[in-house]
Regions:
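A generic structural motif
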Residues: 23-27
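Conserved N-terminal Rossmann-fold NAD(P)-binding element of oxidoreductases
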Residues: 4-9
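Structural motif
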Residues: 3, 65-66, 98
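N-terminal Rossmann-fold NAD(P) dinucleotide-binding loop
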Residues: 13-14
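Glycine-rich phosphate/pyrophosphate-binding loop and the adjoining helix
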Residues: 129-149
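Aromatic pocket-lining residues of Rossmann-like dinucleotide-binding sites
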Residues: 20
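NAD(P)H-binding glycine-rich loop region in Rossmannoid oxidoreductase-like domains
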Residues: 29, 34-85
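Conserved Rossmann-fold NAD(P)-dependent oxidoreductase catalytic core, especially the SDR/UDP-sugar
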Residues: 85-128
Length: 149
């Protein structure tokens, strides 16, 4: 069993949380505040934090093995650049052993890959259309691969 942090835990994140909980993992899902009840209904622990303010996520990393950074469809360039880079820099001093990055933005994927190499934290990139039927299964498989690394 591992603890997985899902940032943010929107609709796709909650589907992933349900599957990870069913597999026996502890899951913590972040929200800016609007989806606390929906996250709790998945069996995940809700955590109020903002990916635009990395400092608000630091306490959520306690005991976390895998971070799922699911910002691929959010049209905020900073989440795929400065904030993403800052997250990786902060992960060095945590128990995190892997990151799943939703790689819809080429610049963000490049930062994630470079950061993975620099900080020696394994990375799995989810690419392709997140609306496809296999997205959740692909995300679960990415988490499983990181846990096996």
């Amino acid at each position: 069993m591992a603890r997985v942090l899902i940032v943010p835990c929107g609709e796709r994140g909650r589907a992933l949380a349900r599957e990870l909980r069913a597999a026996g993992h502890a899951v913590r899902g972040t929200t800016r505040g609007a989806h606390v009840a929906e996250i709790a209904q998945t069996g995940a622990e809700p955590y109020v934090g903002d990916p635009d303010r990395i400092a608000t996520l630091m306490d959520a990393l306690h005991g976390v093995t895998i971070v799922c950074w699911l910002t691929g469809t959010i049209p905020d360039a900073d989440l795929h650049a400065g904030r993403l880079r800052m997250l990786w820099e902060k992960l060095v001093d945590t128990p995190v052993r892997g990151v799943v990055y939703e790689g819809m933005i080429p610049e963000g994927e490049a930062i994630a890959r470079a950061s993975s190499q620099t900080w020696q934290i394994p990375l799995e990139v989810l690419d392709g259309d997140p609306r496809r039927e296999t997205w959740t299964a692909d995300a679960v498989a990415a988490v499983d691969r990181l846990l096996g690394a």
